[in-house]
């Protein structure tokens, strides 16, 4: 059985790639494409400026949103709570529509929708419902804080968030983290990590990684592959700074191209080199960046598996992955999960959850 960060069976496999095409398995809706985090001009001045309902106008049916708000209000009025109505509405809307509900609910009833729901719900069901109403930035920040604020750091959650978000989203996350927790995210990560692992995460937080629009430059990327070879397999010891710089600045498509060049130069795949040259959390971080670049659905499938296997459930991680991917590639993640583990992802999630919490996650998984 494969654990976290492992490549697909048989290695990450040959990626048929030419400069005119992105590598197979890379371009997944929402992963590195524009719009994943709904970034809007003006966010740098106000961490929540991106989420004013007027920004969305043309893609939103305001009457439908208002109807949803009225139904949610009715589900929470009087004795008892109509959990099924809450689940049905929130799981059948996308993140943009749900965030609009927060705006319109306040306008219609002068009440904070999230606070209203938190007062009616409890446990992991509450956590999942609130996550559905979070912006991508809020979901990231809560995940990062949860990974660090308790004794024992969840390094793999840090890797998942920092290694798979485009730079513009990490830049917004840094601003919102300060706004929510009155802490500097970079300083907090620095205080909770160490060694080369810390250097990799801090490099990612510099937000210099190229996005999906960055053009492929074959000559430049071949040079990068040579530098990786000279910094690792071709020498005694490892030049960690070369690996950190390349993996923290190159886009997933560029990393896929570099991997092919590296295979031709070194006669061994890049993933094997990472496993050989690094260890511990630094190895996990670089392998995580690599795997998420080559095949995002399989990478996120390993994160779901990590959350549900063994004793106990990593509920915060499970909720974040399912909610954050539900508008994009959750169906592909389910397929990848079956390919990797010969198991049904929905069944495994259902076996590890219960009650209304189970219903929420099941509804999201059934949508795709």
What are these regions (language model features)?
Residues 2-368:
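Structural signature for extended repeat/solenoid scaffolds and their inter-repeat hinge/linker regions
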């Amino acid at each position: 059985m494969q654990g976290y960060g492992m490549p697909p069976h048989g290695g990450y496999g040959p990626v048929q790639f030419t400069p005119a095409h992105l590598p197979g398995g890379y371009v997944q809706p929402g992963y590195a494409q524009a719009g994943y985090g709904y970034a809007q001009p003006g966010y740098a001045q106000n961490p929540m400026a991106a989420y004013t309902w007027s920004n969305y106008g043309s893609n939103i049916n305001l009457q439908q949103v208002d109807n949803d708000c009225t139904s949610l209000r009715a589900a929470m009025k009087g004795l008892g709570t109509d959990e099924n109505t809450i689940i049905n509405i929130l799981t059948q809307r996308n993140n943009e529509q749900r965030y609009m509900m927060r705006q319109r609910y306040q306008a219609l009833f002068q009440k904070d929708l999230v606070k209203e729901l938190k007062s009616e719900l409890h446990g992991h069901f509450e956590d999942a419902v609130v996550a559905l109403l979070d912006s991508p930035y809020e979901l990231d920040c809560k995940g990062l804080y949860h990974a660090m604020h308790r004794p024992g750091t969840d390094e793999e959650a840090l890797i998942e968030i920092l290694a798979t978000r485009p730079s513009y989203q990490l830049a917004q996350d840094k601003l919102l983290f300060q706004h929510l927790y009155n802490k500097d995210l970079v300083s907090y990560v620095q205080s909770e990590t160490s060694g080369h692992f810390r250097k990799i995460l801090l490099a990612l937080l510099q937000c210099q990684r190229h996005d999906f629009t960055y053009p492929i430059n074959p000559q430049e990327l071949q040079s990068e592959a040579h530098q990786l070879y000279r910094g690792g397999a071709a020498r005694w010891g490892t030049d960690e700074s070369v690996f950190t710089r390349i993996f923290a600045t190159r886009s997933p498509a560029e990393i896929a191209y570099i991997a092919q060049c590296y295979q031709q130069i070194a006669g061994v795949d890049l993933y094997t080199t990472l496993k050989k040259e690094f260890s511990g959390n630094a190895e996990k971080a670089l392998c995580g960046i690599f795997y998420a670049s080559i095949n995002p659905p399989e990478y996120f499938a390993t994160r779901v598996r990590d959350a549900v296997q063994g004793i106990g459930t990593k509920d915060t991680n499970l909720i974040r992955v399912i909610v954050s991917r539900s508008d994009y590639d959750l169906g592909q993640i389910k397929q990848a999960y079956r390919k990797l583990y010969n198991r049904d992802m929905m069944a495994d999630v259902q076996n590890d959850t219960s009650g209304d919490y189970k219903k929420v996650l099941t509804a999201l998984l059934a949508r795709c």
